[in-house]
Amino acid sequence: MTFRIAVVQPICHPPGSDAANIADAERAIARAAGEGAEFVCFPETYPGPWRMPATFDPTAAMVEAAVKHRTHVVFGTIAPIDAKAATAHNLICMAYPDGRAPARYRRTHPNGPWIYTGGPAWEFQWVPGDEFPVFDTVHGKVGLAMCSEVYMPEVARALALRGAELIFMPAGKDKRKLWATWRTLIWARAIENLAIVVTTQNLFDHSERGLAMVASPEDILFESTIAGTAVVDVNLERVRYLRATRDQVGSSEACAAKQGVLGPQWQRPELYERIYPRPQREAAE
């Protein structure tokens, strides 16, 4: 069954005026739903807030918009832990069209807290999460991740092994010299996990180079570097076929991705602990 995903790459109100992003997001949801979108994907930390102490929480507004327009809304915010210590989890959430409590993923990588302090946009002491939840929807199983976790293949693989067929991995802001490798890795995560992977990012002005993208295991379905919203048709039947079937001699004549790489034909989990022993890690300084 084909369904539609709206990928929103907004001009973002910066820290200090970021509460204004909520109204912009509500308008984008209404427009996307009017074009038949059953998922609307915003960037990391959009609508916000970007900093601690948090001055607003967009969750109720995003849930209300999802219910009003009968769509799923993937959005970014933070979950304050301690206002005095300025600690928070960084979240990617998904609001449901039936109004249930939103799905939430707490960013897990890298080791915190250094990544969200000292720059011009974010300012909080990030506390990593430690779970890789996967969420059921009427269209398929959804995994959530974010931003430079694309450089950690373990994140998307964990979601895929838990059944995620559609992985939203929205990002924060201008990637500068990382742009080309980032783009490559979004598609790589789709190829190696036999999944649809979706990303987008915030733009603070029209001079910045964006990266909005929908990748399947066999093709890039959509990509854009400019501000705006695109509605993309997606079908998970091919993903399910590639996962359910076995690779064999000559299969490359019909398949542009390797079949069955998540299953026992390819996987050898008994080797992986020897390859990569996992000592207890300290947080990075």
Predicted regions mapped to residue ranges:
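Active-site-proximal beta-strand elements of phosphoester/diester hydrolases
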Residues: 2-14, 104, 140-149, 168
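Active-site beta-loop-alpha junctions enriched in small/polar residues
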Residues: 10-13, 78-80, 106-110, 147, ...
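Acidic/histidine-rich helix-loop elements
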Residues: 11-20, 117-120
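Cys-nucleophile CN-hydrolase/nitrilase-fold catalytic domain and related Cys-dependent amidase chemistry
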Residues: 15-106, 175-191
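CN hydrolase (nitrilase-like) catalytic-core segments centered on the catalytic cysteine
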Residues: 55-75, 141, 147-230
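Short beta-strand scaffold segments in enzyme catalytic cores
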Residues: 75-77, 90-94, 133-135, 210-214, ...
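Active-site catalytic loop in hydrolytic enzyme cores
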Residues: 83-162, 175-184
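C-terminal beta-strand edge segments of enzyme domains
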Residues: 202-285
